Amino acid sequence: MSTGETQFQTGGGITVSLAASTVDGNAEIENLVDRLDEARGVLLSSSYEYPGRYTRWDMGFADPPLAITSRAQDIWVSALNERGTVLLEPVYEALAALGSTAGIVDLRHEPGDAAGAVVCRVERADRRFEEEDRSRQPSTFTVVRALVNLFSCDDPHLGLYGAFGYDLAFQFEPIALTLPRPAEQRDLVLYLPDDLLIVDHEGGIAQRFRYDFAVDGRSTAGLAGGGARVLYEPDFELEASCDHEPGGYAAGVRAAHEYFARGDLFEVVTSQMFSEPCIESPAELFRRLKEQNPAPYGFLINLGPASAGRGEHSVAGESGEWLIGASPEMYVRVEGERVETCPISGTIARGQDPIDDASQILALLNSAKDESELTMCTDVDRNDKSRICVPGSVKVIGRRQIEMYSRLIHTVDHVEGRLRSGFDALDAFLSHTWAVTVTGAPKTAAMMFLEQHERTARAWYGGAVGKVGFDGSLNTGLTLRTIRVADGHAEVRVGATLLWDSEPDEEESETELKASAFLDAIRRPRSAAATGVAASVPSDRRVLLVDHLDSFVHTLANYLRQTGATVVTRRAGFPTEEISADNFDLIVLSPGPGRPDDFSIGPVVRASLDAGLPLFGVCLGLQGIVEYFGGELGQLSTPMHGKPSAIRILGGHLLDGLPKEFRAGRYHSLFARRSEVPDSLEVTAVSLDDDIVMAVEHRELPVAAVQFHPESIMSLDDGVGLALIRNAVDRLVPGWRAG
């Protein structure tokens, strides 16, 4: 549905006609993903929410009219279809107006596959630039800035979209390059779209924006779009490999230690690259990543073949190149005068469940090493902003905040500043090249170390992807957690932040963990994702759960049902004759408030034993069993309500297969006095912090009990709670001897 047409003029005198329409966002996104298997273009997709930082959105396009490509100092602005030819002349004139004083040399038109290109070279300046002006020295960004000025307008969506390679940093901060670069490596691929899909998932709005451009009597209206097609072709003969042998990455950590010891480096982020044969298409990999690894900066970018957009004729059969990513880290975002970054440093693996996650988060937040990592990153980031921001405006607005991803938990800082007069979004972009979280500190020394010690050139890794808006905005994410697909295979490069406290083998393991989610996306179909819910095995066992007005009884019943048993939960106070009349196989005494006598637990125990039925008690249930057999109860000086304790196993059968020490949750004030536990009962577990009886078993009868709550979230570590309940059902019902 059309929502209207508008017309405006850019800062360079180009007339833009805009037609907007409402579309089916999900259907259009799926269609675009499929098109990007063959057509050049970009899809940027945020599938991660964080209040005040990230929302869910998609923006993308295929078959753009213009591409801007660079390698070292050489730059090509190429028309990719007939519509792009209309824009080449104003591009040429904008660059010609800058001339050699801005470093633009060898400016010319060249023929190409579609309709030619404007080609130039940017020469390094032969004069000194003060540090405050370093971002204005001649570089590839001189051309990018000229294009932004040519198309400058208030439209919030029109801009240059694509990928920025790692080597662009050396135009800002030159160092000696020692690693070989492949001939096909490109440092920059940006596209100017004319047909944009924008989906705001939070607002529930999906729109298509179509642009026509007119200048000097020529217009794109009515001209054909489209572009060349390159199909991905897997190479089935390739084998998986890594640019480091096992232990090689750890050896690099040890080498870095020498630099830390001398004070040459404070931290450095070294990487290793894994290569895999890849039979799936880039579109399928993107869908897998989005499903398995939601992230604020997801992307699928078809960069075209290496020769495309460089004023050259494509070679028959030449492979394309794609970037598919799920980056967790904002690189630089600029809106108006506000500059934002979100440095990530400090990493720990996700737990097995939310409770385990909480323990991992505490471990991460309590790690002095991880705190030091992030502190150094943020100090360097603040320095990057101070070059181009208003004095006093650079502030940390979020400190060591937790962000959780599919397999990792990170600590993140949120830093902002306000641009000084005379600086723009590209100055902010350049002043941060590249983020300390992918290089190190001091930054120049770290990049020199990486050039000397990494095994292969980074190419796109550690650079950025995103959008340079013609309205002065900028939104970019770091090129991390990215799959590069080319030549029939897929590459995944991952790194870790090293500092003096780093343990070499642990850092190597961290890189392997980071890579695992993306290697899985290459290897494993979407439908193979595990649900994490274990199926119960049906059995013919019937369990009576006696409810002592407890608030956790239904969770306990749930655990019992997970063993496959049929569970009947019956409020205490029923006639005890029902115990023998209803064909139960196990009687379970629940927790509850008060004392055992308040619920007449003794008669229930007597009736169960008379019926020859095994008995299992939890919390109040343990207290009732101990009293029945002649033991005495005491009262804790400090109640243990909703508090965990470490439990040590002393013996018995009920706790077989559990760790010798484990964590469990307690909700009680009464306890069984250990010195008064009768000889007929064996104490099989105690709490480590206060030496309270935590489990008992009858020496001859199938009777057992625990003081802690196996059904509590505090008892989830290593699946201890459910394992205990399985033991109770499997071992008590047949009796100890048979179990």
Question: Which ranges hold each PLM region?
Answer:
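Extended alpha-helical targeting/anchoring segments
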Residues: M1-D540
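C-terminal and late-domain segments of enzyme folds
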Residues: T3-E5, A79, E682-G739
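Charged helix-capping and loop-helix junction motifs
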Residues: E284, L478, D598-R606, G721-I725
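Catalytic beta-strand/loop cores that center a nucleophilic Ser/Cys/Thr
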Residues: G463, H653-L701
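N-terminal beta1-alpha1 cap of cysteine-dependent amidohydrolase-like domains
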Residues: A517-S600, A607-L613, R726-G739
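Short gly/ser/thr-rich secondary-structure transition/capping motifs
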Residues: V567-G573, S645-R648, Y667, A685-D689
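Cysteine-nucleophile active-site neighborhood
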Residues: D582-R663
